[in-house]
Amino acid sequence: MISLRLLKRNTFSLFKILKCQTMAKSSFEYVKKFEADDSLLPNTWIVVRLDGKCFHKFSEEHDFSKPNDIRALRLMNYAAFTVLREFNDVLLAFGQSDEYSFVFKKSTTLYKRRAAKLLTTINSKFSSSYVFYWKKFFDEEPLKYPPTFDGRVVLYPSDENLIDYMKWRQADVHINNLYNTTFWTLVLQGNLTPQQAEKRLCGTVSADKNEILFQEFKINYNSEPEIFKRGTLLIRKSVFNKNLDKNSNIIVDTHDDMLKDRFWKDHSSLLLNRSKEILMYDGPVTDIVAEQINLIKE
């Protein structure tokens, strides 16, 4: 039997602890009132877009190939892949050069849709993965200093707005890559200085740049790799697993043409809330796809 005196002593001690905690809470917790409510509007598409900060300098310091370094692009894609792998609420992602956009499911309630939480979590996961997996793509080429990515959160109220956003980002790939391909061809093969190449391209349109590439350097821009011309789309699809005799869900990296309405017709279920339609993948087995298939086999 616990003595009455001991019981009173323990009760009094517990009362003092609870009283101190209550006083501390009431004394200091008022500072939480200064926190802004950044919950994003419901029933809207949330897009987090990350951009490399001072990446021109970063690419020069690390001797990236011009106009495109396939190692750097594959690293960007893999870093984005780790984001989708960890966060199921990210529906798809699209990247090019030093930029990546992450589209959340319209119905997501992740982190109560708080903008700061979503942005910082996606950015930190992506940035840390870029550093962590550097050696996977650059072998013995050392990472001289960690890169910096800034980010923003944008809301799109309708499916049409989101589709136009995706088309805008892919159109940007074409515009930038055609210019950069022509610019660096003039510098590296045409022996022009960067200033001379810039002056040569001033006022030119797409047809002019294609003409320069083909007539002067026998380069057919249409034959350039799709990853350079279209960027990379990461999307969730299914593949048939012969070992398990069923479909397995994976994240695939593709270079589909999102500027064409055909893509959105073929993927119409993608934007439907809680759609049960399965998007099957029959494309090439990329490194990202192969890695997931091998894990399924194990």
Locate predicted features.
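Regulatory and interdomain segments flanking nucleotide-handling catalytic cores
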Residues: 6-7, 12-298
